[in-house]
Design a protein with these regions (language model features):
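A Zn2+-metalloprotease active-site environment signal
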Residues: 8-257
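Sec-dependent bacterial lipoprotein signal peptides
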Residues: 1-8
């Protein structure tokens, strides 16, 4: 119990307490291993215009994220981030951001994001998962579930191997990339809210988020990957509508440098 309490941390974006039993450096090593293995087999899109769109929006979201953390004295949270933006030739409606800022977008989701604003909804959301250390939190929860509190201390003494093994499960980078251990409702709410903040600070219109998630919900069986681990459509859209008025203060013209 003392070990678990000592490992409690606070989400830098929202102040929520979270349990982190895996160090940032260890998580980064494990996630980069999974990412590099995936990118060796993934087929990058040959569509120059679409690729440029992903890079363009991704860079603006990344810059806004960095600015938000700088303004709030949390620059250290991104010290190991090296942003990369990839568009993969795959018809799935999916995207993800690995720890360290490795962003992957599937061509399929561009069908649902016709404008840069729409794509910013997706990328803002996924970046939050990485910055808020949601993957670390899931891995920590799995360590507790796998080993139990009684032998957790002994397990952690050998957790390099355990971390690599859990990374394969948590990140799920393979034929079903993105179908990972589901983020909790808390994680999704954080990603939805802070994703809106980041995209707004980047100069995008957060109001399009409602339309994007409505299109996702109308996709039915064709979009199970992203929706399967997220809250119900009605719950998400209702929450986003509640968040939108607050986004006004994050618009670039309203922020003080």
């Amino acid at each position: 119990m003392l070990l678990v309490v000592a490992a409690c941390s606070v989400v830098p974006l929202t102040g929520r307490r979270q349990m982190l039993l895996v160090s940032d450096s260890e998580l980064l090593t494990a996630s980069l291993s999974q990412y590099n293995a995936y990118m060796k087999t993934a087929v990058k899109s040959s569509d120059k215009a679409k690729t440029e769109k992903v890079v363009r929006v991704g860079r603006r979201i990344a810059a806004a994220t960095e600015e938000y953390l700088r303004q709030n004295g949390m620059e250290s949270e991104l010290q190991n981030f090296r942003w990369e933006f990839n568009l993969i030739k795959d018809k799935q409606h999916n995207a993800f951001c690995m720890p360290g800022g490795k962003i992957v977008v599937y061509e399929g989701i561009l069908d649902l994001t016709p404008t840069d604003d729409d794509l910013a909804v997706v990328l803002g959301h996924e970046v939050v998962h990485a910055v808020a250390k949601h993957s670390n939190e899931r891995m920590s929860q799995q360590l507790v579930a796998q080993y139990g509190a009684a032998i957790l201390s002994a397990a952690l003494s050998k957790k390099s191997a355990a971390t690599q093994q859990l990374a394969s499960t948590v990140f799920g980078l393979g034929t079903q990339v993105g179908v990972m251990l589901p983020f909790s409702r808390k994680h999704e709410s954080e990603a939805d809210y802070m994703g809106l903040v980041f995209m707004t600070m980047a100069g995008y219109n957060p109001n399009v988020a409602v339309g994007f998630w409505q299109r996702m919900s109308q996709g039915g069986s064709s979009v199970p990957e992203l929706l399967s681990t997220h809250p119900s459509d009605e719950t998400r859209i209702a929450a986003i509508r509640r968040y939108l008025p607050e986004m006004e203060k994050y618009k670039p013209r309203n922020r003080k440098n």
